[in-house]
Amino acid sequence: MTPKLGQKKRHRITVVCTNCKKRKSKCDRTKPCGTCVRLGDVDSCVYLIDSSGQPESSPSLNDADPLRKQSTPAERISPGFIKKRRSSQTRQDEDHWQRVRELESQSSLYYLPIHEETPFFIDLIPNGFYLETKRSADNLFGLFSDRAIENRDPYLQAMVTFRSIAIKKMMDKLGSNGNNVKNGSLPKSFEALSTFDADDERHISDDVVDKGNNCRMHQTIHKSLFNKFAQYRENNAKKFSSETILAKDYLPPLKILESEVLALFEEKIYNMIPIFDMKILRHEITIFYQNIVEKGNPISIKHYDHMVFCIILLIIKICRLSVQFSKLTPYIYPVLQEIDTSKFLALVKHYLFETKVLRKCNLLQLQCLILLRFLHWCAPEDGDGPETQYCQILMGTIISSCKEMGINWYCFSHPEKYSFKINRHTRPSYDIMKPSDYISVFRKIWSYVLFWDRKMCFISGEECQIGKTLQCHFKEEADTPTWYIRMLTLDNLMKKINDTLNDDPGKVDLNLLHRLINDLKRNFHILKSLSKNEKETMRHFDFEMEWIIDLFSLSLLHGEMIFYEYDCNITKFYKSFQDLWDMVIHISEKCYNYFFNSDALEVDSLTKFYTNRIVEIVANKVLVIVPAFILRGDRFKTIQYADKKKMIEFLYGVSSVYFNEFGFEYYRCFRKMFTAKIAYKILNRSCEKDAWRIILNFLLNELKLEDNGDSYIDYNDMRLKDICPIILEFQETVQKYDGYRPDILSIWNNEFYPIGKYNDDMTGFKFQMRIKEMQEFLDMEKYSDRFNIFSSFYDHASSQLAKHTEVDTNISITNEQVAETPQKELLQQPLAPALPVNDLIVSEFDVIEDIFDPVDFVSFF
């Protein structure tokens, strides 16, 4: 502090409110804050002596925050902006800090002043929002979904467009021979996989029998997976008649249900979905068995027997998933594993929509909807969609039902003001469920629904549906009976992050977002460290929360890098490029440890059916983002061809882990394997066949064919210029050159996408590959002694179909280098010859062949 400032400002002794951080003079400490009165926090309004002393001389947050991993605020501010300090805290900035009252006396960090930063805005939708319409659904994809990431990134957008066109060309080629295969139990998106599968099987002859136990195993596994996933969909689509449904045909005896199913549910699973009073639930189940199962009475919809039936079915199915994915010995819970749950989901859907679910709701019905939402998240079937894009409608129904029933913030802020009238035919009845029980269950349900609403914002970037938040402080740990209630203290921060992200995605304050994320990390870390009870049973929640925050940071870093690239901010672009790569490596290491060193994570094996989901989403995000680094490799002098090959080997290793660990069980993972293997084949090229150059040539060629009316694209489909407008703009830039033109990459890097003309030497940037941290994926020996679904499904099919495939091409393939499983190759310098403009138009399969084997599109993957 300067002497001048010291003379102007007097430092009176003040006290600080532990709730809202409002400062008052010491003599006013007996009066509660107006903010606390408004929020109903009068009882918890306590003042502590302001320990900040002289605010303007306090150390910065960067010195006090040991968890801060990203760049400092000064590094994140764009050149020309200045960082301001303030002499006093405003309430608006103070609201950015959510503190747990019990923790504040233990940590001096929370009394450090917050430095105000000049906002720095970035555009997370440079190519607009991504909306897809199809026969069955219209979807606006969240900002951090796979589709939105690919739409934002011009390199990924071009690669995905190339991949889809090339696959369609080969499908048309097979279809012209009458080889299209459709499976009525699988969606239309599986037609390509089924067609290639059948085509391969037709061409396998007796002369390969001696070669191939591998061949037979390949066919057996592939067919069994197709059949299994087709059976999933067939079972879920099954129709029932209420008159023919007998509960005893689907439910185990009550004694087994109580001793095996409910015991497991209460001990291991209930804390994941604490929406019941277990005493009341057991009572309702006993009544249901006495009246319906044992006496053989029909299931009454009028008396809501069907809702109790559905709750039992969902609990059994969830418990069975817990045992199935625990990988424990089959002798654990043997009776549970023998229960056939294949029709349970169809039964639940049948009964749910027998009631007026879109008009009114009761407690049992709401609990059933929440269980169904939980099952969609955990189950191997494709309940939420491959990118969680189908979860919002069910979640919106749950949230609307909560509000209709009075399950909202009032059950925390004004529980004493609820006035109940419980009618005699209510279920559960008044004899078993009193008003105080309703308040307790309402609190559990609201905290659970609220967290899931916030969680989906962090996972996919979609906007929260619950638009209100409150500051929550609890006097005793007894007031937080569930993990979700404990997390209410973080809700204000999570909602602010959502608002900062979604209020205007084209103008997101990056500085504010970084500050809020760091605050969230810090507060969550302290909450986790102070958990006294149920520490063993809560680790999977803490595990998931940490991964959710990492996933959000990863997606945000990618959006940040794309913005700097468009903005030609070379210094920031290089730094964000390195930060994003480091984050990818860090998350990949976590995935590896989850699969191969899970004991160190201290996550209960019976909860893995739940934690698998967030790991699957995060690992998939790595597979989406890594190709963006490989395609950009030529922009950096410090990234040599050997480095790109290491990246490709890394992609292969992560893909092998992801698909071998999840592809056999999870429908959504299996269906991604086709495009993932094609993407890998696109990128795994020899040095003189740069993938990005070939993609650009292919798409420019396709545009020309489209203009001439010779395109393979059906006239009912969108044009390439509409699907990938950046290529149309690039074509206009290329056409400015007459006669001979420079290398197409030079035009892209220097003229069209000018950040490429800057040299690494200007900033002293040197890319760090982190080979040591990547090593586990580079030496992928985990699957060397067993079937590797990612490599075997493709390579074998390619060798079998080579002699049966005719490729319409004028280019000799004698010297074509085939991309196989990653291996060391001689390093060569990329070739960049000048090309005549009239050579841009080539035979329709020439460019495909230049990047693929002749059989790449008639293989499985």
Curated annotation (Swiss-Prot):
Pfam family, one: Zn_clus
PROSITE patterns referenced in this protein's UniProt entry, alphabetically: ZN2_CY6_FUNGAL_1, ZN2_CY6_FUNGAL_2
Gene Ontology molecular functions: DNA-binding transcription factor activity, RNA polymerase II-specific; RNA polymerase II cis-regulatory region sequence-specific DNA binding; zinc ion binding
GO cellular component: mitochondrion; nucleus
Compartment(s) of residence: Cytoplasm; Nucleus; Mitochondrion
Principal cellular location given in the protein's record: cytoplasm
Keywords: Cytoplasm, DNA-binding, Metal-binding, Mitochondrion, Nucleus, Repressor, Transcription, Transcription regulation, Zinc
Record InterPro entries: OAF3 (IPR050675), Zn2-C6_fun-type_DNA-bd_sf (IPR036864), Zn2Cys6_DnaBD (IPR001138)
GO BP terms: positive regulation of transcription by RNA polymerase II
Residues annotated to bind DNA: 19-47
Region (Disordered): 52-99
Annotated Polar residues bias: 52-61
Highest taxon listed in the record's lineage: Eukaryota
SMART domains, sorted: GAL4 (SM00066)
Record's function text: Transcriptional inhibitor with a significantly increased number of target genes in response to oleate.
Family, per entry: Belongs to the OAF3 family.
Protein name from the UniProt record: Oleate activated transcription factor 3
Source organism of this protein record: Saccharomyces cerevisiae (strain JAY291) (Baker's yeast)
